């Protein structure tokens, strides 16, 4: 995180350079809220656990795959030292972005959800009772991704595995387990030194 000359914080990523973060609080205040519910994490975990084979797919730059209506693009306008810009695709920071994205993903996979796969935002879990069944299910999901121009981040995808991490939990045929690496990180945190 670095600050520009106006004291605004700009997030940086070591691997991919600059990442633009826009403060859309003023826009969000006047935006009519979309109350589309996100799935409950515990229910997602229950549905995906207990299978012998999995494929874990990750949507590439999730929100950014959704186009913004031309009439709404001007609402995302921002100015930076390089000029004035407006997004053509949905950025982070818009209050309705999570609901819009989840609705879109559920629409894309409406006939597959809870039967051969589960989707939570840009995380897609495909499963099967046998290796062959999981492979057939994966093929169906990948065909749908191609059909709908949904781009995946292959570096974050895992294919035909016995277990994996979903929403911070380890899932497998045995069920749901806590990710011990996450617990260790929390245990190693220093104790708070101030009280608010």
Region locations from a protein language model:
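Retroelement reverse transcriptase polymerase core
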Residues: 1-196
């Amino acid at each position: 995180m670095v600050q520009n000359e106006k004291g605004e914080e700009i997030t940086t990523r070591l691997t991919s350079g600059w990442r633009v973060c826009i403060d859309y609080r003023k826009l969000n205040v006047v935006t009519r809220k979309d109350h589309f519910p996100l799935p409950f994490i515990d229910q997602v975990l229950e549905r995906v656990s207990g299978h012998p084979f999995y494929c874990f797919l990750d949507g590439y730059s999730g929100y950014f795959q959704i186009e913004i209506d031309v009439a709404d693009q001007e609402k995302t306008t921002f100015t930076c030292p390089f000029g004035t810009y407006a997004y053509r695709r949905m950025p982070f920071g818009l209050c309705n972005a999570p609901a819009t994205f989840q609705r879109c993903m559920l629409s894309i996979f409406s006939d597959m959800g809870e039967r051969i796969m589960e989707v939570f935002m840009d995380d897609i879990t495909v499963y099967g009772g046998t290796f062959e069944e999981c492979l057939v299910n994966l093929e169906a999901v990948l065909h749908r991704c191609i059909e709908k121009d949904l781009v995946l981040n292959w570096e974050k995808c895992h294919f035909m595995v016995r277990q994996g991490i979903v929403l911070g939990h380890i899932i497998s045929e045995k069920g749901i387990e806590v990710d011990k690496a996450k617990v260790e990180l929390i245990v190693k945190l220093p104790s708070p030194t101030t009280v608010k």
